[in-house]
Amino acid sequence: MSSKSMVLGYWDIRGLAHAIRMLLEFTDTSYEEKRYICGEAPDYDRSQWLDVKFKLDLDFPNLPYLMDGKNKITQSNAILRYIARKHNMCGDTEEEKIRVDIMENQIMDFRMQLVRLCYNSNHENLKPQYLEQLPAQLKQFSLFLGKFTWFAGEKLTFVDFLTYDVLDQNRIFEPKCLDEFPNLKAFMCRFEALEKIAAFLQSDRFFKMPINNKMAKWGNKCLC
């Protein structure tokens, strides 16, 4: 393992790490991954992670984690901000920083709605309710983006990586969900066209699925 490489630890799924992976790729950061594998049903053995969870000198042991020399960070958005600060991707003006802060929190609230649905044993019965309210939520993001190029304004920031990932997961869940929102679709295309992102999406380091872990009711399988 290179002493100069960051180490990203997470389950072998997209989950909360996908936006981090994309930001690492976009910023040309040298990194390696430590992927932990969850066991199969019915036990879903998590011992690969639990056996080392309290041995890594993490203040709040959890996944994902990022290790960068003496800096050891948990909480996915704290990791994103840590990387983004190194590359001036947290917004420049006060307006940009406010928009970044709003989006960081709003998109995570939105993410967790889909996460809770996907891991709920009553998933199939709850899915119609989620889909019914989805357009209203997407409309809010569409209005917030407006005619801006990126969600903070005209400057690419880490929340664009976060937002792309969450919108993409919803697009996989309901393929037509963005059709009513041309500016969101254009945002997705712009993001995918970024040179480093386009290269990552075509690389063997990228995987579309699984989004969730094996105990989830949706998004828990690889695409063959």
Swiss-Prot record:
Major location (coarse): cytoplasm
Principal EC category: transferase
UniProt-listed InterPro entries: Glutathione-S-Trfase_C-like, Glutathione-S-Trfase_C_sf, Glutathione_S-Trfase, Glutathione_S-Trfase_N, GST_C, GST_mu, GST_superfamily, Thioredoxin-like_sf
Subcellular location, record wording: Cytoplasm
One Pfam family here: GST_C
Keyword Transferase: yes
Listed GO biological process terms: cellular detoxification of nitrogen compound; glutathione metabolic process; nitrobenzene metabolic process; response to estrogen; xenobiotic catabolic process
Subunit structure, interactors included: Homodimer. Interacts with PFKM isoform 2 and isoform 3 (via N-terminal testis-specific region).
Record-given protein name: Glutathione S-transferase Mu 5
Species annotation: Mus musculus
